[in-house]
Amino acid sequence: MKLSAEMKAFEARLGYSFERPELLVRALTHGSISSSTRQDNQRLEFLGDRVLGLVMATALLEADKDATEGQLAPRFNALVRKETCAEVAREADLGAVLKLGRSEMMSGGRRKLALLGDAMEAVIAAVYRDGGFAAAEAVILRLWGARVHQVEADARDAKTALQEWAQARGQTPPRYELVKRSGPDHAPVFTILAELADGRRAEATAGAKRQAEQAAARKLLDSLD
């Protein structure tokens, strides 16, 4: 299989040249374009998530030999979460070569966080299957770059941080309420309210409930004394 000029340019951005280019094509093929043949990237995404986790766990252990499991876990989560994968995908301009069905393309799929994050994990798996663990590790460390060393020791997801803040002050856990759902079925938008027992609250909107909850929790955290 011969790759298009756009795909070759993406290979260059990855810093890896495929011996089996069909793996890269599959990694960049979303289910909206291939549901009948199952030649999409879902299985590769599953594998890539595990490869990414192993590489990041190893990198963190080597970067800080004195860190405890409790210190490493939140850093690890910050590096492998979908938002970070999507951020890396955007930097590599993965959206430009993502193969989507017409409806997904029309709804802005090339910019969707979930699709970009999933495709980035699938690309990692494609590199792993094509060139082995060392090749995948090299690509991951190149793309994630300084994030491995810059991720803060107290990095943790916003919902966990907000719950810890509440518990430290004797409050019950924060509650999250779906305020509004809008948009078409293929591209829903959720507005979530995060509220503390003392009445302080914040709202946020995102394309997935979990992301909206995290954004609302972060917004509320940022407003606290």
Curated annotation (Swiss-Prot):
Location of the protein in the cell: Cytoplasm
Q: Where does Mg(2+) bind?
A: E45, D118, E121
Q: What EC number(s) has UniProt assigned to this enzyme? A: 3.1.26.3
Organism, as annotated: Ruegeria pomeroyi (strain ATCC 700808 / DSM 15171 / DSS-3) (Silicibacter pomeroyi)
Give an example GO molecular function: metal ion binding
Q: Name one Pfam family in it.
A: Ribonucleas_3_3
The lineage, from the top, is: Bacteria, Pseudomonadati, Pseudomonadota, Alphaproteobacteria, Rhodobacterales
Q: What is the name of the protein in this document?
A: Ribonuclease 3
Write down the InterPro entries for this protein, in alphabetical order: dsRBD_dom, RNase_III, RNase_III_dom, RNase_III_sf
Which family does the entry's similarity section mention?
A: Belongs to the ribonuclease III family.
- For whether the record's keyword set contains Disulfide bond, the answer is no
**Role played:** Digests double-stranded RNA. Involved in the processing of primary rRNA transcript to yield the immediate precursors to the large and small rRNAs (23S and 16S). Processes some mRNAs, and tRNAs when they are encoded in the rRNA operon. Processes pre-crRNA and tracrRNA of type II CRISPR loci if present in the organism.
Residue ranges of domain DRBM in the record: 157-225
